Amino acid sequence: MAGMRMAAPLMALRSGQSEAAVGVLLALFALTQVFLALPAGRYADAHGLKRPVMWSVLMAFVGAGLAALWPIFPVLCVSALLTGGATGGAIIALQRHVGRAVKDTAQMKQAFSWLSIGPAFSNFIGPFTAGLLIDHAGFQWAYAAMAVLPLLGWLCIRHTRELPPVIKPEGHEKNRA
């Protein structure tokens, strides 16, 4: 998402969109996260790590792929919604998995330290790669590369061992946020 969040506004400004339109475009990257946070958490609780991340990878791939195929402002807006929501869903599933996988406080500190490095690395590699590709090959190639990056993430976690589901005690009321 970070590469898309950098490239899409640049393309929008270059194509003559107003600053207000670009502001809306940037806001769309967060909008789906607002509305999907609770359902994504419930989905991760019900299905573990891999299925929510698989859906997130698919959403990010489609979002960036659409921008690569049709780099026009309305499609960039759809791409922002898809890639933003995908990022939020994946992070929720990963945080849930890591929190359940640790056995003690020391492991928790180490695991969440590593988990925080992931988004930081993504916030570097995405915009850096997109910027280089925009300069040397154009926006469409940058968007295509941003579509491939989530697939690489999937390759990293596809063999992760799923944790057993959480068994709720009998008579446990369904909590709703």
Predicted regions and their residues:
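Cytoplasmic helix-loop-helix junction between adjacent transmembrane helices
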Residues: 81-118
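Residue-level signature of mid-helix packing/kink "hotspots" within the transmembrane helices
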Residues: 30-38, 123-124
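Helix-breaking motifs and short loop linkers at transmembrane-helix boundaries and internal kinks
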Residues: 16, 48, 69-74
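Structural signature of the two symmetry-related core transmembrane helices
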Residues: 51-65, 147
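Symmetry-related core transmembrane helices of the 12-TM Major Facilitator Superfamily/SLC fold
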Residues: 142-158
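Paired small-residue
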Residues: 74-82
